[in-house]
From Swiss-Prot:
Residues 1-24 form the signal peptide. Sequence repeats lie at residues 63-77, 78-94, 95-111, 112-128, 129-145, 146-162, 163-179, 180-195, 196-212, 213-229, 230-246, 247-263, 264-280, 281-297, 298-314, 315-331, 332-347, 348-364, 365-381, 382-398, 399-415, 416-431, 432-448, 449-465, 466-481, 482-498, 499-515, 516-531, 532-548, 549-565, 566-582, 583-599, 600-616, 617-633, 634-650, 651-667, 668-684, 685-701, 702-718, 719-735. It comes from Arabidopsis thaliana. One of its GO terms (biological process) is seed germination. GO terms for molecular function: structural constituent of cell wall. The keyword Protein transport does not apply. This is Proline-rich extensin-like protein EPR1. The gene is EPR1. InterPro entries: Proline-rich_CW_protein.
Length: 761
């Protein structure tokens, strides 16, 4: 026992001595360590091993507990023996080396340094928080939405987009009150109004003297679409181009300026409201157009002057400039495309079409016109303002004849027919859900450019159309129309001679009336109508060819389609009529544009179309015919001829005016019905436009109602189209798409026809 105790005591003494030494060393080491720390980096600290011993000291504490027991055992006696061993301490030094092994524990020190690093790590965590701040920047993306909001402002012109919808209801209310709350809309725009006061528009006020035309105010509803006013800014420059001194168009510039400043199409809208006064002009003009139909011969004489008229920059130039200008600034049209999304805007695109018609008067513009078609959808709003000017042209019957001459010129520039096609497509779109399609339409516009190439082929068809008019009637007997399409190319050979014939075509027009009697035959054809239903199937078959075929051949057919477009425009009106008389009016304006597309003989038709805008005038004469056209049947007859040959469409237009005047018009409707079956054939050309068919769905639903109401529509001033804007149709469009799919039992066939029609458009 003693030995162990002695040894134990010795061990304790050694530990104590070592611990004392280590404590001293530790203090020095700490001093040195701190010195190194402050002086340099961590390189020196590692060499300092003293530090580890300081840490190793903890192990000694472990032993210290045993030390306490020994004290207990330390009897005074034992202590003396212990001291002697201390003398032996020399040997103990050897143990000190063993102490070095504890330095192995140094690792604990390194661990401390790591802890230091962790703190830096912690700092990074704080930076991470700053990133959370970045997420707020992410919120900034919502701000980008602001730019869209700006577009809505155009739509909303009012403080909030919601207002724009409210505005649509107001249009509905407007119909109830011919007084036209629309004038009130200008008050809303009053902020911009200051600009307007400068505009000469007050003169338009003078034009308003005819309160009856207040229905023309309907255009104001149309103006609602002005929201796309982005394109309008483009028009402003056009207005400047129009600077053609005479034009009050300067007035238009004010509207244009307004859009630029607030970007608020609303300001433009006020002008649209004022523009309704301009619509008033259109009504007066329409009466002259009516006269024109009575005297087709007269229009031919005008043809010669027409060329001169183009020189007169005052009328056509001003109008054309706007259309041309639109092309000049296609860039805006892209922005407009968003507006196109806006259903309201699409409708107006048709209004633009009328300007294209004017463009034809001067072939030069025609190229620009193509861009306008694209732009037209973007900036349908201005087109309405332009329409009033076209209307003014109608006031001078001679002017409308100028349009006919332009048609002749158009053959020189086939491009028109292609551009027109594009517009036609747009018109249908506006009528229906198209609003959505309108964007697609815009896409087509770009493809349209490629069509321009086709237009050259188109040239031949356009020219044939003139002289062909006579031949076309024979073609009509051959309802097969399909082969006839081929014939149209032969017609193309005549094209050039046809120009001189233009005058003769008017005489031909008289025979055309007999040809209408053939339409009466079409009623007999009605028995075949069952067969026609198969013909409809053929159209599908034909369509397959068209995909490949259509590219080359279509150009000529395209011209034919232009004429078909007339009938399509009519159909759209019927469609609108069923939904509400108001709809038909809006559509009718598009028809007006479509007629412009046919520009050839159509020039006359466009005026009739204008009549629809003002139910008062048109009701007496064409409105009824128009209504009949609304009945898909009427337009179909035209389409078949167009399908057969482009010429047929041409003469058919001139004929149309007389039919309008003549009571025979009722007869048309019956014959027309068989044609509806034919319409499917016409669709064959249209297939390329198939995208629009979606729009057609809306028409199917409406079309059925149209037939019964057509008569009512003429009498009713329902044109008050103010409702039209409401129809604007976004709601209608959603509903209509489903109806077409649902396909009412009876309507489906007609709906199918409507699809092809839209395609042409």
């Amino acid at each position: 026992m003693r030995v162990p105790l002695i040894d134990f005591l010795r061990f304790l003494v050694l530990i104590l001595s070592l611990s004392g030494a280590s404590v001293a060393a530790d203090a020095t080491v700490k001093q040195n360590f701190n010195k190194y720390e402050t002086d340099s980096g961590h390189a020196h600290p590692p060499p300092i091993y003293g530090a580890p011993p300081s840490y190793t000291t903890p192990p000694p504490p472990i032993y210290s507990p045993p030390i306490y027991p020994p004290p207990i055992q330390k009897p005074p006696t034992y202590s003396p023996p212990i001291y002697p061993p201390p003398i032996q301490k020399p040997p103990t030094p050897t143990y000190s080396p063993p102490i070095y092994p504890p330095p192995i524990q140094k690792p604990p020190t390194p661990t401390y340094s790591p802890p230091i690093y962790p703190p830096p790590i912690q700092k990074p965590p704080t930076p991470t928080y700053s990133p959370p701040i970045y997420p707020p920047p992410i919120q900034k993306p919502p701000t980008p939405s602001y730019s869209p909001p700006v577009k809505p402002p155009p739509v909303q012109m009012p403080p909030t987009p919601t207002y724009s919808p409210p505005i649509k209801p107001p249009p509905v209310h407007k119909p109830p009150t011919p007084t036209y709350s629309p004038p009130i809309k200008p008050p809303v725009h009053k902020p911009p109004t200051p600009i307007y006061s400068p505009p000469i528009k007050p003169p338009p006020v003078h034009k308003p003297p005819t309160p009856i035309y207040s229905p023309p105010i309907k255009p104001p509803p149309v103006h609602k679409p002005p929201t796309p006013t982005y394109s309008p800014p483009v028009k402003p420059p056009p207005v400047h181009k129009p600077p053609t001194p005479i034009y009050s168009p300067p007035i238009k510039p004010p509207p244009v300026h307004k859009p630029p400043t607030p970007i608020y199409s609303p300001p433009v809208k006020p002008p649209p409201v004022q523009t309704p006064p301009t619509p008033i002009y259109s009504p007066p003009v329409k009466p002259p157009p009516v006269h024109k139909p009575p005297t087709p011969t007269y229009s031919p004489p005008v043809k010669s002057p027409p060329v001169q008229k183009p020189p007169t920059p005052t009328y056509s130039p001003p109008i054309k400039p706007p259309p041309v200008q639109k092309p000049p600034t296609p860039t805006y049209s892209p922005p407009i495309k968003p507006p196109p999304v806006k259903p309201p805007t699409p409708i107006y695109s048709p209004p633009v079409k009328p300007p294209p018609v004017h463009k034809p008067p001067t072939p030069i513009y025609s190229p620009p016109v193509k861009p306008p078609p694209v732009h037209k959808p973007p900036t349908p709003i201005y087109s309405p303002p332009v329409k009033p000017p076209p209307i003014q042209k109608p006031p001078t019957p001679t002017y409308s004849p100028p349009i006919k001459p332009p048609p002749l010129q158009k053959p020189p520039t086939p491009t028109y027919s292609p551009p027109i096609k594009l517009p036609p497509v747009k018109p249908p779109t506006p009528i229906y859900s198209p609003p959505v399609k309108p964007p697609p339409v815009h896409k087509p516009p770009t493809p349209i450019y490629s069509p321009p190439v086709k237009p050259p082929p188109v040239h031949k068809p356009p020219t044939p159309t003139y002289s062909p008019p006579i031949k076309p009637p024979p073609v009509k007997p051959p309802t097969p129309t399909y082969s006839p399409p081929v014939q149209p190319p032969p017609v193309q050979k005549p094209p050039t001679p046809t120009y001189s014939p233009p005058v003769k075509p008017p005489p031909i027009q008289k025979p055309p009336t007999p040809t209408y009697s053939p339409p009466i035959k079409p009623p007999p054809v009605k028995p075949p109508t069952p067969t026609y239903s198969p013909p409809i199937k053929p159209p599908p078959v034909h369509k397959p060819p068209t995909p490949t075929y259509s590219p080359p051949i279509k150009p000529p057919p395209i011209h034919k389609p232009p004429t078909p477009t007339y009938s399509p425009p009519i159909k759209p009106p019927p469609v609108h009529k069923p939904p509400t008389p108001t709809y038909s009016p809006p559509i009718k304006p598009p028809p007006v544009h479509k007629p412009p597309t046919p520009t050839y003989s159509p020039p006359i038709k466009p005026p009739p179309v204008h009549k629809p805008p003002t139910p008062t005038y048109s009701p007496p004469i064409k409105p009824p015919p128009v209504h009949k056209p609304p009945t898909p049947t009427y337009s179909p007859p035209i389409k078949p001829p167009p399908v057969h040959k482009p010429p047929t469409p041409t003469y058919s237009p001139p004929i149309k005016p007389p039919p309008v005047q003549k009571p025979p018009t009722p007869t048309y409707s019956p014959p027309v019905k068989p044609p509806p079956v034919q319409l499917p054939p016409t669709p064959t050309y249209s297939p390329p436009v198939k995208p629009p068919p979606v729009q057609v769905p809306p028409t199917p639903t409406y079309s059925p109602p149209v037939k019964p109401p057509p008569v009512q529509v003429p009498p009713t001033p329902t044109y008050s189209p103010p409702i039209k804007p409401p129809p604007v149709q976004v709601p209608p469009t959603p509903t209509t798409p489903s109806p077409p799919q649902g396909g009412y039992g009876t309507p489906p066939p007609y709906a199918y026809l409507s699809h092809p029609i839209d395609i042409r458009n």
